C-alpha cells in the first residue's frame, strides 16, 4: 500500500538541472549548478558537434522499467537514472530542463498558480484566469513575474552556436514526431554547433487519461 512506499526526495546533484548544466557547459555557456559527471564524460569523449535532448513528458525511470518491452531501444541504451524536481509537475520539470534552474529559482511550479498581485489563480502558459478564457492581464503574467532565459536563447547568442526548441503535442492534429524528426535532421546539418531541445507530451498525456497502470 501507499503507507509502505519509500519517500523519494529530489537530488539536485543528480537530477534534471544537472543534465541541463552539463549541456550549457559543453556549449560554453554559463551555468549555475553542478553538472552531471556521467554526461560530462560522454560529451567530452564523443566531442560531437551537435546535441539533441529529447524530453518525453512523464517517462520516468519506473515507467520505462514497467514498459521496457515496448520501449526496447530506450531501455537497452539506459546508462543511469536521475532525479526529477520537487514539485515533480510537468511545468516545474520542463522549465528546469529549459532553463538550467531549480524550481525555487524559476518559480514555474505548476500548470495553475496563484498570483497575489491579481488575487487570481492563473493558467501560466495560456495567461488566463483558471477555468475561464479571460485574459489575466494585457501582458503575459508568468513570463513577466517569473522571467528566465531559456538555454537555447543563451546558446543562440554565442558565435558559431545554434539553440532551438521544438515541441510536439499528441493532441494537436497538425503536429507529429515525424515532423519533429525532419526538423532535427535539417537543424543538425548546419555547419554551426547545434543544440536541439525536443519536447513531447507523451506518455504524460496518456497517463492522465488512463492511469499509470494501464496498457
Predicted regions and their residues:
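Short acidic, Gly/Ser-rich segments with clustered Asp/Glu that frequently serve as metal-coordination loops
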Residues: 58-62
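A short, charged/proline- and glycine-enriched loop
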Residues: 47-49
Amino acid at each position: 500500500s501507499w503507507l509502505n512506499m519509500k519517500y523519494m526526495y529530489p537530488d539536485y546533484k543528480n537530477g534534471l538541472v544537472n543534465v541541463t548544466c552539463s549541456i550549457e557547459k559543453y556549449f560554453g555557456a554559463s551555468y549555475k549548478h553542478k553538472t552531471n559527471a556521467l554526461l560530462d564524460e560522454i560529451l567530452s569523449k564523443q566531442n560531437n558537434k551537435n546535441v539533441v535532448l529529447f524530453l518525453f513528458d512523464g517517462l520516468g525511470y519506473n515507467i520505462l522499467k514497467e514498459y521496457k518491452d515496448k520501449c526496447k531501444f530506450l531501455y537497452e541504451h539506459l546508462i543511469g537514472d536521475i532525479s526529477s524536481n520537487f514539485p515533480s509537475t510537468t511545468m516545474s520539470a520542463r522549465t528546469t530542463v529549459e532553463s538550467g534552474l531549480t524550481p525555487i529559482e524559476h518559480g514555474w511550479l505548476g500548470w495553475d498558480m496563484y498570483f497575489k498581485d491579481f488575487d487570481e489563480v492563473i493558467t501560466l502558459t495560456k495567461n488566463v484566469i483558471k477555468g475561464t478564457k479571460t485574459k489575466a492581464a494585457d501582458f503575459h503574467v508568468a513570463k513577466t513575474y517569473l522571467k528566465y532565459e531559456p538555454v537555447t536563447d543563451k546558446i543562440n547568442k554565442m558565435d558559431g552556436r545554434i539553440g532551438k526548441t521544438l515541441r510536439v503535442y499528441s493532441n494537436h492534429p497538425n503536429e507529429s514526431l515525424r515532423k519533429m524528426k525532419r526538423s532535427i535532421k535539417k537543424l543538425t546539418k548546419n555547419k554551426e554547433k547545434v543544440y536541439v531541445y525536443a519536447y513531447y507530451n507523451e506518455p504524460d498525456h496518456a497517463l492522465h487519461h488512463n492511469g499509470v497502470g494501464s496498457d
